[in-house]
Amino acid sequence: MKADIHPDYHEINIIMTDGTEYKTRSCYGKPGDTLRLDIDPKSHPAWTGQQRVLDTGGQVAKFNKRFAGIGARKK
């Protein structure tokens, strides 16, 4: 393999939505950085069966505003 072409693989801290913390190895950030999850297997609708709107930064509102005029017309 070629030398010095691979990213640095180091230990980081993961904090899940319920506050659980664990260490893993990743190329994310710098050694010792913390990755705080917005959604994880304990809170994801695909695994919990619950529907919820995840509007990060107003993306849903932005979409609705942009496409408000498009849709089926009422008769």
UniProtKB/Swiss-Prot annotation:
SUPFAM superfamilies noted in UniProt? L28p-like (SSF143800)
Molecular-function GO terms, alphabetical: rRNA binding; structural constituent of ribosome
Could you name the Gene Ontology cellular component terms for this entry?
A: ribonucleoprotein complex; ribosome
What is any one GO biological process for this UniProt entry? translation
- Entry-linked InterPro entries: Ribosomal_bL28/bL31-like_sf, Ribosomal_bL31, Ribosomal_bL31_A, Ribosomal_bL31_sf
Q: Per UniProt, which keywords does this protein have?
A: Ribonucleoprotein, Ribosomal protein, RNA-binding, rRNA-binding
What is the purpose of this protein? Binds the 23S rRNA.
Q: Which HAMAP family match?
A: Ribosomal_bL31_1
PANTHER family in the record: 50S RIBOSOMAL PROTEIN L31, CHLOROPLASTIC, LARGE RIBOSOMAL SUBUNIT PROTEIN BL31A
Q: How does it assemble?
A: Part of the 50S ribosomal subunit.
Similarity section: Belongs to the bacterial ribosomal protein bL31 family. Type A subfamily.
What is the protein's given name? Large ribosomal subunit protein bL31
Q: Which gene encodes it?
A: rpmE
